[in-house]
From Swiss-Prot:
Substrate binds at D106, G107, S108, S109, N196, K262. It comes from the Bacteria. InterPro entries: FBPase_C_dom, FBPase_class-1, FBPase_N, FBPtase. Binds 2 magnesium ions per subunit. This is Fructose-1,6-bisphosphatase class 1. It comes from Shewanella putrefaciens (strain CN-32 / ATCC BAA-453). Mg(2+) 2 binds at D103, D106, E268. The gene is fbp. It catalyses: beta-D-fructose 1,6-bisphosphate + H2O = beta-D-fructose 6-phosphate + phosphate.
Length: 330
């Protein structure tokens, strides 16, 4: 089996980008260690702090954020970083070539119940000149690499550099990420969907109708039965989609009119959309392809519908759109 470093060499990924990806992977090993120790290390539970989104921070949110910040500052290739746990972008090195956006611990509400959590990251090119928030506001099509690390029964890294999606598994003895799936592929059709049903009454009418038709199964207009899955961590739900197909959605809702969307574009939706498209799936807000969105702020939120291409098309048809053409990977 190839190690991650060997794989990057075989894919002709340039040295500086390879170095950055390896830094993120090495840091995820340390995060995996902290997650596994849990209560034994006193890292569970919440703090009295809130992040910029007004969410109460877990102890591990802060710990993992600091671990990634420290590693990226020491890497030498990073111009700046943006994190879910940071109010503003952070300047790292004036000589850096890359910008890194990340969610250090996606699904952190799961940590106290020993359920799935993960790290999501996106790598963008840095431009010359002063580093500002605007430097980061690039469409998802500009991503040079993206991935996530899933901390579950085994620790897994899903990665794309624009050459498909590869899956690596952390070997518990050698502490190396080894290539275990060289070409992850999302089936075009599915009978699984993932959505937070507790918000049903707050969704837009197209989404309510779409889900209602799925629930009708064989006796409804879809004429087949569907199963619902929900992990309450985007990283876990998207991993399932990449592994065996499905559709994952966190749609627009009016539960809080000031916050109609849940997921963040720059460090959740964009990297996951890049992975999904590279694996043959599709990703949309319901009205726009996610990777084509021009961001307006670093913590911008969007609706997300992603997964098996035919099922995403079916969902979008309820929104009055036809996305039957294959997405551009340029």
């Amino acid at each position: 089996m190839q190690t991650l470093a060997q794989h990057l060499t075989s894919q002709a990924v340039n040295d500086s980008l390879s170095q950055l990806i390896l830094t993120l992977a090495d840091t995820s090993k340390a995060i995996s260690h902290a997650v596994r120790h849990g209560a034994l290390a006193g890292v569970l539970g919440a703090t009295e702090q809130e992040n910029v989104q007004g969410e109460t921070q877990k102890k591990l949110d802060i710990i993992t954020n600091d671990m990634l910040k420290d590693a990226l500052k020491a890497d030498g290739t990073v111009r700046g970083l943006a994190s879910e746990e940071e109010d503003h972008v952070v300047e790292v090195s004036t000589n850096g070539q890359y910008l890194v956006c990340f969610d250090p611990l996606d699904g952190s509400s799961n940590i106290d119940i020993n359920s799935l959590v993960g790290t999501i990251f996106s790598i963008l090119p840095a431009s010359a000149g002063e580093l500002t928030e605007t430097s980061f506001l690039q469409s998802g099509r500009n991503q040079l690499a993206a991935g996530y690390v899933l901390y579950g029964p085994s620790t897994m890294l899903a990665l794309t550099t624009g050459q498909g999606v590869q899956l690596f598994t952390l070997h518990p003895e050698t502490n190396e990420f080894l290539l275990t799936n060289a070409a992850m592929s999302i089936s075009a059709d599915t009978q699984e969907f993932a959505i937070n049903m507790s918000n049903q009454r707050f969704w837009e009418a197209p989404m309510q109708t779409y889900i209602a038709d799925l629930l009708l199964g064989k006796i409804g207009p879809r004429e087949k039965s569907f199963n619902m899955r929900w992990i309450a961590a985007m990283v876990g739900d998207v991993h399932r989609v990449l592994s065996r197909g499905g559709i994952f959605t966190y749609p627009t809702d009016n539960k809080d009119p000031k916050k109609p969307y849940k997921l963040r574009l720059m460090y959740e939706a964009n990297p996951m959309a890049f992975l999904v498209e590279q694996a043959g799936g599709k990703a949309s807000t319901g009205y726009e392809t996610i990777l084509d969105i021009q961001p307006t702020q670093i913590h911008q939120r969007v609706a997300v519908i992603l997964g098996s291409s035919n099922e995403v098309d079916a969902c979008l048809s309820y929104h009055g759109l036809d996305y039957s053409e294959e997405p551009s990977l340029d």
